[in-house]
């Protein structure tokens, strides 16, 4: 279980996240929603320790994540894989090598520097690419891919980290509707088939309601809603999004898939 206690992040006198407290059970798919600047990205970056909390604690399975340093902190960052809006791929490297970067915490430094990857890791990376129908692109440069393809590569890279938790920060913000569905389906597949907890920042309420089993709403750095998607009424949503409400509530729902293919990578969730 992930437990957040009074988590706060200040930049000068402004609190980007203000006393956030909640807990998340293993295997959940949680959407973090709210208008731009609500504190969603800062919250996820604190959970991965890319941003340092000013106050509060992050506990995972009883371990105080906020106290981790050095090797233990690097191990935590591998266990809590980040997926970014900007993809964060190395454009000049091929797709397979970009995915293998997710194995950095599992191999000696000289192997990654020399790009001499163990065969088992290469097989793992290819299996991850195959999960998202991009294995044929393994030898292609990352900067030659479409935005949707690049985000699927980033998700495959996160999966080979063998994480307990995936933190997706606006993963579909720059994508068209077709690629948005492909990427959200990929995250749902990871969650349902591998039992990996997913915490995903989303701007679209339709997507959040379709894919997530729980929503956490933020406004001005504070958590103002925490519940099932069905509990988020339009009136609450309009208060949450204020002037942006018409933009995030105006499109038709994108329904989550009823079924998915049997995975080939890792352990299937019970």
UniProtKB/Swiss-Prot annotation:
Task: Quote the SMART domains the UniProt record gives.
Answer: AAA (SM00382)
Database matches in PROSITE patterns: ABC_TRANSPORTER_1 (PS00211), ABC_TRANSPORTER_2 (PS50893), PHNC (PS51249)
Name of one Pfam family that matches: ABC_tran
A GO molecular function assigned to this protein is: ABC-type phosphonate transporter activity
Give the reactions, separated by semicolons, that this protein catalyses.
Answer: phosphonate(out) + ATP + H2O = phosphonate(in) + ADP + phosphate + H(+)
- Localization per record: Cell inner membrane
Which keywords does this Swiss-Prot/TrEMBL entry list? ATP-binding, Cell inner membrane, Cell membrane, Membrane, Nucleotide-binding, Phosphonate transport, Translocase, Transport
Q: Per UniProt, what is the membrane topology? A: Peripheral membrane protein
The residues that hold ATP are: 34-41
**EC number(s) of the enzyme?**
7.3.2.2
Q: Which GO terms describe its cellular component?
A: plasma membrane
Name all ABC transporter domain ranges: 2-245
| Role according to the record | Part of the ABC transporter complex PhnCDE involved in phosphonates import. Responsible for energy coupling to the transport system.
PANTHER family named among the record's database cross-references: AMINO ACID IMPORT ATP-BINDING PROTEIN, PHOSPHONATES IMPORT ATP-BINDING PROTEIN PHNC
**How does it associate, per the subunit comment?**
The complex is composed of two ATP-binding proteins (PhnC), two transmembrane proteins (PhnE) and a solute-binding protein (PhnD).
What family does this chain come from, according to its entry?
Answer: Belongs to the ABC transporter superfamily. Phosphonates importer (TC 3.A.1.9.1) family.
Q: What's the protein name? A: Phosphonates import ATP-binding protein PhnC
Which organism's genome codes for this protein?
A: Rhodopseudomonas palustris (strain BisB5)
Gene that specifies this protein: phnC
